[in-house]
Swiss-Prot record:
<feature type="binding site">
    <location>
        <position position="133"/>
    </location>
    <ligand>
        <name>Ca(2+)</name>
    </ligand>
</feature>
<keyword id="KW-0479">Metal-binding</keyword>
<feature type="binding site">
    <location>
        <position position="135"/>
    </location>
    <ligand>
        <name>Ca(2+)</name>
    </ligand>
</feature>
<feature type="binding site">
    <location>
        <position position="137"/>
    </location>
    <ligand>
        <name>Ca(2+)</name>
    </ligand>
</feature>
<feature type="domain" description="EF-hand 2">
    <location>
        <begin position="45"/>
        <end position="80"/>
    </location>
</feature>
<keyword id="KW-0677">Repeat</keyword>
<dbReference type="Pfam" id="PF13499">
    <property type="entry name" value="EF-hand_7"/>
</dbReference>
<comment type="similarity">
    <text>Belongs to the troponin C family.</text>
</comment>
<feature type="modified residue" description="N-acetylthreonine">
    <location>
        <position position="1"/>
    </location>
</feature>
<dbReference type="InterPro" id="IPR011992">
    <property type="entry name" value="EF-hand-dom_pair"/>
</dbReference>
<keyword id="KW-0007">Acetylation</keyword>
<keyword id="KW-0514">Muscle protein</keyword>
<feature type="domain" description="EF-hand 4">
    <location>
        <begin position="118"/>
        <end position="152"/>
    </location>
</feature>
<dbReference type="InterPro" id="IPR050230">
    <property type="entry name" value="CALM/Myosin/TropC-like"/>
</dbReference>
<feature type="domain" description="EF-hand 1">
    <location>
        <begin position="9"/>
        <end position="44"/>
    </location>
</feature>
<keyword id="KW-0106">Calcium</keyword>
<dbReference type="InterPro" id="IPR018247">
    <property type="entry name" value="EF_Hand_1_Ca_BS"/>
</dbReference>
Length: 152
């Protein structure tokens, strides 16, 4: 799969948002300001996710990130949002009766169609883990967990 890249305009907007917070022109911003920078661009990121991402990017534990690291986080968030939209669209298409659930039979067919060539046993295990209440249906959150875990 090709790597996700933000558009030039998105990157310019992200750099501008960074500069708006980097008022002293130090070339870095506090990791504590990342939530506000995301928000200024209309993106909502939970505090715990920002902390995880900051810890990952701030290898020297300075509590600050430079603009390049910020752009990497910005692109990661855009990709996550895109993936979420694609998953929601796939779920919507598969939810033929528009009840907010997919029948397990449909899910079984999807899993058997994936390029990974899952065995029947693997498919049944995945369905059992997903449809924990045995209702024969899977809601969006269960579908999302399954698709993210199977890296489909």
């Amino acid at each position: 799969t090709e790597e996700f890249r933000a558009s030039e305009k998105q990157i310019l907007d992200a750099k501008q948002a960074f500069c708006n917070v980097d008022k002293k022109k130090e070339g870095t911003v506090s990791c504590k300001d990342l939530g506000a920078i995301f928000k200024s661009l209309g993106l909502l990121v939970k505090d715990d996710k920002i902390k995880d991402w900051s810890d990952e990017m701030d290898e020297e534990a300075t509590g600050r990130l430079n603009c390049d690291a910020w752009i990497q986080l910005f692109e990661r968030k855009l990709k996550e949002d895109l993936d979420e939209r694609e998953l929601k669209e796939a779920f919507r298409v598969l939810d033929k009766e528009k009840k907010g659930v997919i029948k397990v039979d449909v899910l079984r067919w999807i899993l058997s169609s994936l390029g990974d060539e899952l065995t029947e046993e693997e498919i049944e295990n995945m369905i059992a883990e997903t449809d924990t209440d045995g209702s024969g249906t899977v809601d969006y959150e269960e579908f999302k967990c399954l698709m993210m875990s199977s890296d489909a």
